[in-house]
């Protein structure tokens, strides 16, 4: 046990009032706490992946079975690629890119950054394919572009998502940004990532409702199988978003800082507060 650990143990024992059971309680905390949190975390991550993957599968079944399948020919089958690509890209891959910092918390920071940026790039490419598909379909069918709230929200989300990816690339993967700039932009980057996930899910819900009203407006109130399946998709998307936000915002699931990151934090505090870094 290190000197710092012994000091921490002594402090906790003193807070316990020196009772005989205090050391036993402390030992139980050390032995069972991390394992219990780890198993809960693994279960929550697994549940999030099930929700996300099932959402993609439901979207594929909806568009493939009930809406005629997929093609790239300007027909309604090309439109069917739009919801599939958007759920896969802006929801599932986007959420997983955010989650890698929690799942791989003990891996080298540079590797996690590369994985984070790569998954986001795949999400961006997939989403662009989905947007091109719907624009092609509208052009071929002589349908006006960007007239609905769903289209406004979707295009705004995609543009901001693209900007977020470029800013992250410039600040965190390229070596040009200073430590002060990175530390300043990091909270904004994290907040924008979660906000964009919420926007993507909200826009998806608008799109689901819009598609149902266009396709089965007369039979939708009769609880048709297609309508029920699409409603379940919406519920799963919401649950996926809630679970992702929970995992990302819980303090105990945050990535523990390594010595290099702690040194950077001390350096940033010195720059902003004018104090001298404490010696170890």
Sequence positions of predicted segments:
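Hydrophobic alpha-helical cores of multi-pass transmembrane domains in eukaryotic membrane proteins
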Residues: 47-61, 80-98, 115-132, 152-170, ...
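Non-transmembrane, juxtamembrane loop and terminal tail segments
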Residues: 2-33, 256-280
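Polytopic transmembrane helical bundles with strong interfacial aromatic enrichment
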Residues: 2, 7, 36, 40-46
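Juxtamembrane loop segments immediately following a transmembrane helix
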Residues: 163-188, 198-225
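Juxtamembrane membrane-interface segments at transmembrane-helix boundaries in membrane proteins
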Residues: 29-42, 68-85, 113, 140-153, ...
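Membrane-proximal N-terminal segments immediately preceding the first transmembrane helix
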Residues: 2-3, 12-37, 56-72, 94-102, ...
